[in-house]
Amino acid sequence: MGKLLSFAIPCYNSAEYMEHCINTVIAGGEEVEVIIVDDGSTKDNTYEIAKRYEKEYPNIVKAVHQENGGHGEAVNTGLKYATGKFFKVVDSDDWVDAKSYKRMLATLRSFDEGKEPDMVIANYVYEKVGAKRKKVIHYENVFPVEQMFTWNDIDIGKFKVDQYILMHTVVYRTKLLKDCGLSLPKHTFYVDNIFVFEPLPYVKNLYYVNTNFYRYFIGREDQSVNESVMISRIDQQLSVNKRMIDSFLEEDPGNVNCRKYMINYLRIMMEVSSIFLIVSGTKEHLQKKKDLWKYAKDKDEKLYRKLRYSLLGWSVNIPTGLGRWISKKGYKIANNIIGFN
């Protein structure tokens, strides 16, 4: 009997916290496979831990060691080895909720052979260190609940700024990812955006499970979403932005609503990058912000206008100190509401 769900767990010097993550996903039993990818760890016994789990759970866990290639290459490796009908990435410092996990497996199990959705969506929870309350990102105002639907059944205008489909949210049909040729770039952070974005034109049928499945941990100082870390790695974020622009222009989604959603996603990515460049405030970074928007304009004038002429697109491009002040204030308010770092 084939596996129902494949998990890829990218690990890099993750010995301190990876066991909690692994323990939550192996609880699915032999219906699932857990591919632990050690991405060339150098400072701890990450791979030894992965091998121990493989030995203890030979019908569930596969430990893979590779030369360091970055998060994206670890996801690529997980997908390469995946045999399950569905595919899910869980970062090694995150985990899945036990009760929601049972519900998710029951849902995936319920689909008739050959009639499975291309994408299954569930809620995620910000597990932020020191936060007084946990922020839950859910989608019942946007998606039909517990039923198959298409892009035509979605009102794209109902998406709130914190409701976009992220890696934490999605379970993809494995064959779709392999058929569309998804391959994430090496040695690049923030490729989770590419992982979600590039397969979207191939997604026809979707399904939303209104359960708080994924637990997204925020609090490590070296975490990629930490503000200072994001600014230090801004060139990688910009590289991801440009690839997403290119892939959108190269692969027409066909469906009008899918196209609208992808443009909105691109707009948010452009605005987030612009805000971090503004927060940094160096002459070099402010020039990089101009260069990013010029890249979009040079690639496609029509797409540029759709990205540029929105409220946030306008605010991050006001060419004065006032504009930068507005962007910084907006960032602080959004961070307090959403709590993303």
What are these regions (language model features)?
Residues Q66-A82:
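Glycine-rich, basic loop-to-helix element that forms the pyrophosphate-binding segment
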Residues T188, N205-V240, S280-Q287:
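Nucleotide-sugar-dependent glycosyltransferase catalytic core
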Residues H71, W95-L206, I218, D222-M230:
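Donor-binding/catalytic cores of nucleotide-activated saccharide
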Residues D38-E48, G70:
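A conserved acidic beta->alpha catalytic loop
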Residues N13-A27:
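Short, well-formed alpha-helical segments that are part of the catalytic scaffolds
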Residues K3-S6, E33, I194:
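Cell-envelope/extracellular polymer assembly enzymes that use nucleotide-activated donors
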Residues V279-N341:
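Membrane-interface aromatic/basic loop that binds lipid-linked glycans or pyrophosphate carriers
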Residues F87:
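Short aromatic/hydrophobic "clamp" motif used to bind/position activated sugar donors
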